Amino acid sequence: MNINSTLFLQAIVFAILVWFTMKFVWPPITKALDERAQKIADGLAAADKAKSELSSANKRVEAELALSRTETTARLADADRRGQSIVEEAKSKATEEANKIIAAAKVEAEQQSNKAREVLREQVAALAVKGAEQILRKEVNASVHADLLGRLKLEL
């Protein structure tokens, strides 16, 4: 191998090529690579942020669902209590109404019983007068003996 001037010339051309590449070609390539790396890093950061937002949204949804379930349970329990109170109120009103009806029936029965007793007393008094009249064979004046007949009614 002969070392001659072409080898030196080729070395100089190669050095110029390296310098030209380092000065004009390499910076846009590194800039493009850096931009691409930044885009990838931004995308990964956005993905992580979206993932954390999704996680927090899921937690909020779960909290809302739990709150909704609690409210629904409370409303159902409240409705059940209201239903029970309405039923109890209806029962008490029905019992009260039945007691009123029974009391009215007792009062009416007592009045009818008293009326029947009075009618019977009058009939017994009339029968007693007729019986006494027949026994004595003498007419008895009812107006004269009203006091006697009144006592007789009370005794009966």
Swiss-Prot record:
According to Swiss-Prot or TrEMBL, what is its membrane topology? Answer: Single-pass membrane protein
Give a yes or no for keyword Iron in this entry.
Answer: no
The record lists the organism as Albidiferax ferrireducens (strain ATCC BAA-621 / DSM 15236 / T118)
Q: Which GO terms describe its cellular component?
A: plasma membrane; proton-transporting ATP synthase complex
Keyword terms, alphabetized: ATP synthesis, Cell inner membrane, Cell membrane, CF(0), Hydrogen ion transport, Ion transport, Membrane, Transmembrane, Transmembrane helix, Transport
Location in or out of the cell: Cell inner membrane
The cross-references to InterPro entries, in alphabetical order and at most eight, read: ATP_synth_B-like_membr_sf, ATP_synth_b/b'su_bac/chlpt, ATP_synth_F0_bsu_bac, ATP_synthase_B_chain
Function per UniProt: F(1)F(0) ATP synthase produces ATP from ADP in the presence of a proton or sodium gradient. F-type ATPases consist of two structural domains, F(1) containing the extramembraneous catalytic core and F(0) containing the membrane proton channel, linked together by a central stalk and a peripheral stalk. During catalysis, ATP synthesis in the catalytic domain of F(1) is coupled via a rotary mechanism of the central stalk subunits to proton translocation. Component of the F(0) channel, it forms part of the peripheral stalk, linking F(1) to F(0).
Q: Which family does it belong to?
A: Belongs to the ATPase B chain family.
Entry GO MF terms: proton-transporting ATP synthase activity, rotational mechanism; proton-transporting ATPase activity, rotational mechanism
How is this protein named in the record? ATP synthase subunit b 1
What binding partners and quaternary form does the record give?
Answer: F-type ATPases have 2 components, F(1) - the catalytic core - and F(0) - the membrane proton channel. F(1) has five subunits: alpha(3), beta(3), gamma(1), delta(1), epsilon(1). F(0) has three main subunits: a(1), b(2) and c(10-14). The alpha and beta chains form an alternating ring which encloses part of the gamma chain. F(1) is attached to F(0) by a central stalk formed by the gamma and epsilon chains, while a peripheral stalk is formed by the delta and b chains.
Q: Which domain of life is it from?
A: Bacteria
